[in-house]
Design a protein with these regions (language model features):
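Short coil/turn segments at secondary-structure boundaries
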Residues: 4-13, 45-52, 74, 152-155, ...
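Sequence-specific dsDNA recognition surfaces
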Residues: 13-18, 33-49, 63-94
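Non-catalytic DNA-recognition/assembly elements of restriction-modification systems
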Residues: 13-43, 167, 175, 179, ...
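Hydrophobic alpha-helical scaffolding
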Residues: 21-25, 85, 128, 132, ...
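Proline-centric
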Residues: 21-30, 122-134, 146, 150, ...
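A short beta-sheet element
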Residues: 61-63, 73-143, 155, 165
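Extended, well-ordered alpha-helical scaffold/bundle regions in very large, multi-domain proteins
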Residues: 220, 228-229, 243-247
Length: 254
């Protein structure tokens, strides 16, 4: 049949009615936790001077994130003491995907420096050999994925918790198509930026057209309509099996 099923433990569940739209045959619907792990940040105690005096490590808040951009600087920095006591001495590495998790939900940025962030942001780590390809795919499309799955009052109220994020359904294409989708989106970026510039100069233009144009391109991408389907692509179901094997291997090493 044309129904979609998900196996959870020994139970097989029909999830067809939970799916927001159709995807190509060689894509799969999967839970976010099956393709990526994520970590929430922290805010060191504001009344503890040793955490904020002599700050040397960038500490990102949502206001420091720039939508779908690489970010390098923050308004505030934490001390070496704060890093050691509140973050176990661990910085989030440069190149990591960040996404706003509360308030302004779904804003994505790439870390341009080693840093830490607050609890309103998650750092995302794809569970896949070619992490950059999936990172770039999620960087471009997570905002739209989050918008598409706004099916609960909690998400609509801009409060997204770890459980809801883990179980969020993601349309997942083959790896080669992820790369093609990102390349296609990047081709449109200069055109959209130029239109944005012209829009700002022409006050009579519809102020919403820029956002609508950008969103329509991303919607085509997320539904598998932006680039031609290639029958030679390894199906996303096979990619998902590779990810599961890698995840299992990592758990076995702990």
């Amino acid at each position: 049949d044309n129904r979609h099923y998900e196996k959870v433990g020994s139970e097989v569940k029909d999830i067809t009615d939970d799916l927001p739209f159709e995807i190509p045959d060689n894509w799969v619907w999967t839970r976010f936790s099956q393709i990526a792990s994520f970590e929430l940040g922290k805010t060191p105690d504001r009344h503890t001077d040793k955490f904020w005096n002599n700050g040397i490590y960038p500490w990102f808040a949502i206001s420091d994130l720039q939508e779908r951009s690489t970010v390098f600087s923050t308004k505030e920095k934490i001390s070496a003491t704060a890093l050691k006591e509140k973050f176990a001495g661990k910085l989030v590495p440069q190149g990591t995907l960040l996404m706003s998790f509360k308030l302004t939900v779904g804003r994505t940025s790439i870390l341009g420096v080693d840093a830490v962030h607050n609890e309103a942001i998650i750092s995302v780590f794809p569970i896949i050999p070619d992490k950059d390809a999936t990172r770039n795919f999620l960087f471009n499309l997570l905002p739209l994925i989050v918008e598409y799955v706004e099916t609960t009052d909690a998400i609509k109220g801009a409060t997204l918790n770890s459980s809801k994020l883990s179980s969020m359904l993601v349309p997942f294409p083959p790896l080669t198509e992820q790369i093609r989708i990102v390349a296609e989106i990047e081709k449109f970026e200069p055109l959209i930026a130029e239109y944005d510039k012209l829009e700002q100069q022409a006050t009579k233009l519809d102020e919403e057209i820029y956002d609508k144009l950008k969103k329509s391109i991303l919607q085509y991408a997320i539904q598998g309509k932006l680039v031609p389907q290639d029958p030679n692509d390894e199906p996303a179901s096979v990619l998902l099996e590779h990810i599961r094997a890698e995840k299992k291997a990592k758990l076995g090493k702990k």
